[in-house]
Amino acid sequence: MVKEFKEFISRGNMMDLAVGVIIGAAFTAIVNSLVKDLINPLIGLFIGKIDLSNLKFTIGEATFKYGSFLNAVINFLIIALVVFFLIKLVNKITPKKEVEEDPAPTNEEIYLRQIRDLLQEKNK
């Protein structure tokens, strides 16, 4: 069972997935810092509040923390944009597969088609 697990985990796809998850986690930390430490203060300068995550409004007993939601939206948009550009780059670098044309029909296929056509004409 241990041997099977080693074979499973060392296959190419699993290793690619593991590397992707690790890099994704590190990238998320970078994007979070970018949004929190650079983008939010810039937006805060325009709206008069430096810390967007504390933006909220209250209706009765309910408090709506829309600042945290704005942070999450900004994080998502940045990550989506970077993933979009990475996919475009990979598609540009990866060689395109050529579409295989159907091979020419063999003599046998030609004869069978002729027989089929003759039988169809005869049965009309």
Swiss-Prot record:
PROSITE patterns: MSCL (PS01327). Keywords: Cell membrane, Ion channel, Ion transport, Membrane, Transmembrane, Transmembrane helix, Transport. The keyword Disulfide bond does not apply. The chain crosses the membrane at residues 15-35, 67-87. InterPro entries: Mechanosensitive_channel_CS (IPR019823), MS_channel (IPR001185), MSC/AndL (IPR037673), MscL_channel (IPR036019). It comes from the Bacteria. It is found in: Cell membrane. The keyword Ion transport applies. GO terms for cellular component: plasma membrane. It is a multi-pass membrane protein. One of its GO terms (molecular function) is mechanosensitive monoatomic ion channel activity. Belongs to the MscL family. Homopentamer. NCBIfam families: mscL, PRK00567.1-3. Channel that opens in response to stretch forces in the membrane lipid bilayer. May participate in the regulation of osmotic pressure changes within the cell. This is Large-conductance mechanosensitive channel. The lineage of its organism: Bacteria, Bacillati, Bacillota, Bacilli, Lactobacillales.
